[in-house]
């Protein structure tokens, strides 16, 4: 009942907003986030919401999501709950069927190469920050093919592109490994290759 009312209210808001009710937040698209949820938070990847609490940071009291990245459990992220950009980076984990659909589509995924280094850098930074899995797959495939082409010419991948390649793999593969309950990248790669029949 309340979730439907919240979505209706949000539909008529001019600015993206969230509503807080008893340790639960409804994002601008109606997605509910609460303590103990495991989510994706942009380039930080898989995180657990360990608390939603008021803190005074830089002299201002605000409510924050307290996030612990699964791959770096020694770190803590404080993400303000009233920030639309923060909510845009937060999403639910993919389901197993959704991951299977992404894997099955990999062979047909188109690649998009940007020759201008500065434009490519900004584009890839945006993709990493957004954490959209389909966009990350396209980025990984594009860089992988470009890497193979350069190796065939006796050249190496540009350092910037190599770093983007590794970062995209880490974000995407960690989510896949977590959801599919696989022990690491090697197991995931074997899983992907078996699924697409390579």
Please give the residue ranges for each predicted region.
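Short, Lys/Arg-enriched N-terminal segments with co-localized hydrophobic residues
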Residues: 6-31
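A positional/architectural concept
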Residues: 30-87
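Charge/polar-rich, low-complexity and marginally structured segments
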Residues: 82-198
């Amino acid at each position: 009942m309340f979730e439907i009312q919240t979505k209706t209210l949000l539909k008529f808001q001019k600015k993206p907003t969230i509503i807080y009710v008893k340790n639960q937040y409804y994002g601008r698209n109606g997605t509910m986030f609460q303590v103990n949820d495991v989510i994706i938070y942009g380039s930080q990847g898989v995180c657990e919401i360990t608390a939603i609490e008021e803190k005074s940071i830089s002299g201002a009291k605000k409510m924050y999501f307290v996030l612990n990245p699964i791959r770096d459990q020694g770190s803590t992220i404080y993400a303000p709950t009233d920030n639309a950009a923060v909510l845009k980076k937060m999403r639910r984990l993919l389901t197993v069927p959704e991951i299977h659909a992404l894997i099955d589509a990999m062979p047909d995924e188109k690649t998009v190469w940007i020759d201008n280094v500065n434009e490519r850098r900004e584009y890839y930074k945006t993709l990493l920050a957004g954490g959209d899995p389909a966009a990350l797959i396209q980025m990984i495939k594009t860089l992988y093919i470009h890497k193979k082409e350069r190796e065939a010419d006796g050249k190496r991948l540009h350092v910037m592109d190599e770093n983007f390649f590794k970062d995209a793999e880490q974000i995407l593969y960690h989510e896949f490994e977590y959801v599919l309950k696989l022990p690491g990248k090697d197991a995931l790669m074997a899983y992907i290759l078996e699924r697409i029949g390579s």
